[in-house]
Amino acid sequence: MILYHGSNLFIEQVDLQKCRPFKDFGRGFYCTEIKEQAEQMAKRVAYIYGGSPCVTICELNEEAFVSPEMNIKTFRKYSHEWAMFVLNNRNRDFTEFNRVDCNHDNKYDIVPAQLPMMI
């Protein structure tokens, strides 16, 4: 599976410590299957933080989605569960990390959803 990441710099290796916290699916490396979406994000990030728009192309082995070693949280549609997950991840005061409806602690390796995918 080919994925795209829009930023203001080329990403050689994912480093979660460089990823911003309190995003929809938690701190992570957000990607999309839609190249144009990544291009728009790259322009936005470059406008906000400076630099030049850059789209990093990533390849994800689809076997990762069925690997028992991966902890995956899937949202098949927008729902109350999805909304609470996003709300809790955006909440800087949220501290109940053991709950399944948050990813502050990066318990989920992949969160595929209708929005950009976090890996």
Predicted regions and their residues:
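Glycine-rich loop/turn
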Residues: M1-F29, E36-Y47
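Conserved NAD+-utilizing ADP-ribose enzyme module
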Residues: K23-D24, Q40, R44-C54, E59-I119
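Ordered hydrophobic segments in well-structured contexts
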Residues: M1-H5, F29-C31, C54-I57, D109
